[in-house]
């Protein structure tokens, strides 16, 4: 961005609470930096397809609505995460499956392209050992996952194709039922997994890929726990006891997940009502097109967003609500079964933690709550690496 334009746009941001670096004590910041911090659900890859959005450039949440980029990963001490191949659910027809498969492959290629363009600062991780090696090298860690396995159609051999492309985690379903499973936000069709969905579980285990139960119905969750030979995860979910929404999990199932060795990675959505109005969607569409706007259009967008924020914020959830959710999960499941999966760039973020720069606040708060640095390190990344190793060790024994 040229300097005159930067100066022109900087003024509105000087008054923003996001302009200053999050206030965390030097000691807490150092502890956070020394940990391996991984988020299991980064939807920023939705911006990669066109090639016009530069992941290496410093962006601002207030400007384009984005929450993750390489500079902010450094600022927030986020060492890596799962970059998501997301496909919105469509029809269960051969033509729709083909279109979805193409879209998913394009997204996978875009993620690999971005990793390659920034190979001096980040690398593709296929295993837990890869993640630890990249961390030692001072590089950011890029895992790849699939949110919604609808693009597989009825051909489960495509799971191996995506595995070869680097995918190491996948969920069967998203916001609507598909050929594999019932969604938690749809009317039951299969009463859990479909027959093909049960085969999907076996193939995921065979390949050593993590099974992600987020967005799955309660019945699907129960069947995933029953059928999987290794622990499953919820890549971006939360406790229903904190906010009663179908996307969240009840305490009994949280305990069952922990007994099975699984991990719930804590979401920042479904903590409180948020703004899903047409006006908010329109602002979001304009923000996603930030790179193409001229200075006058950018000023107008910032003014319109400020007016809408003053009328109703993008979310009523706060950082304290998020921490209450995480602390409840720890109390129910234990520190070995909780992690971080905030759904950045997929609707995530709360007041006081609007983007990844604020992640050190979590470590600071956990220390204030009396958790040891060892336990915090489990939550920040250790628990993820454990379940990855378990899934891949099972696959290796079966090969």
What are these regions (language model features)?
Residues 1-7:
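Bacterial N-terminal signal peptides that target proteins for export
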Residues 7-17:
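Bacterial N-terminal signal peptides
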Residues 20-191, 244-399:
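N-terminal hydrophobic targeting/anchoring segments and the immediately downstream early-domain regions
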Residues 37-44, 216, 234-237:
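Histidine-centered catalytic micro-motifs
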Residues 155-159, 182, 220-230:
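Distinct, well-ordered alpha-helical segments
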Residues 190-205, 224-234:
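Alpha-helix-loop-beta-strand connector modules within alpha/beta enzyme cores
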Residues 202-223, 251-259:
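Substrate-binding cleft of carbohydrate-active enzyme catalytic domains
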Residues 218-219, 239-241, 270-273:
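Short, catalytically relevant binding-site loops at active-site mouths
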């Amino acid at each position: 961005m040229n300097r005159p334009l930067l100066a022109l746009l900087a003024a509105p941001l000087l008054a923003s609470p996001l302009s200053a670096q999050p206030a965390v004590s030097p000691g807490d910041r150092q502890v956070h930096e020394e940990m391996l911090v991984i988020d299991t659900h980064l939807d920023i890859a939705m911006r990669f397809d066109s090639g016009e959005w530069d992941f290496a450039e410093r962006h601002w949440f207030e400007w384009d609505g984005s929450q993750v980029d390489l500079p902010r990963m450094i600022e927030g001490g986020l060492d890596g995460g799962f970059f998501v191949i997301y496909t919105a659910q469509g029809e269960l027809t051969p033509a729709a499956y083909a279109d979805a498969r193409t879209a998913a492959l394009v997204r996978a290629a875009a993620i690999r392209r971005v990793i390659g363009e920034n190979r001096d600062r980040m690398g593709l991780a296929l295993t837990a050992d890869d993640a630890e090696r990249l961390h030692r090298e001072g590089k950011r860690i890029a895992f790849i996952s699939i949110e919604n396995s609808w693009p597989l159609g009825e051909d489960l051999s495509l799971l191996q194709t995506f595995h070869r492309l680097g995918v190491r985690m996948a969920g069967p379903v998203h916001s609507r039922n598909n050929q594999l499973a019932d969604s938690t936000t749809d009317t039951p069709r299969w009463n859990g997994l479909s027959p093909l969905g049960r085969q999907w579980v076996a193939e995921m285990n065979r390949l050593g890929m993590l099974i992600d139960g987020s967005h799955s119905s309660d019945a699907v969750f129960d069947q995933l726990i029953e059928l999987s030979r290794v622990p499953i995860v919820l890549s971006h979910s939360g406790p229903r006891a904190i906010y009663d929404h179908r996307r969240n999990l009840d305490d009994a199932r949280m305990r069952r997940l922990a007994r099975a060795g699984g991990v719930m990675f804590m979401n920042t959505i479904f903590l409180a009502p948020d703004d899903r109005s047409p006006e908010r969607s329109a602002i979001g569409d304009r923000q996603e097109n930030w790179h193409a706007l001229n200075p006058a259009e950018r000023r107008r967008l910032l003014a319109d967003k400020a007016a809408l924020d003053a009328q109703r914020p993008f979310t009523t959830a706060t950082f304290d609500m998020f921490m209450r959710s995480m602390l409840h999960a720890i109390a129910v499941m234990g520190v070995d079964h909780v992690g971080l999966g905030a759904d950045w760039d997929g609707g995530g973020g709360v007041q006081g933690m609007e983007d990844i720069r604020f992640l050190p606040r979590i470590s600071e708060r956990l220390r204030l709550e009396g958790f040891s640095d060892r336990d915090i390190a489990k939550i920040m990344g250790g628990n993820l690496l454990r379940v990855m190793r378990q899934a891949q060790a099972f696959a290796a024994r079966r090969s």
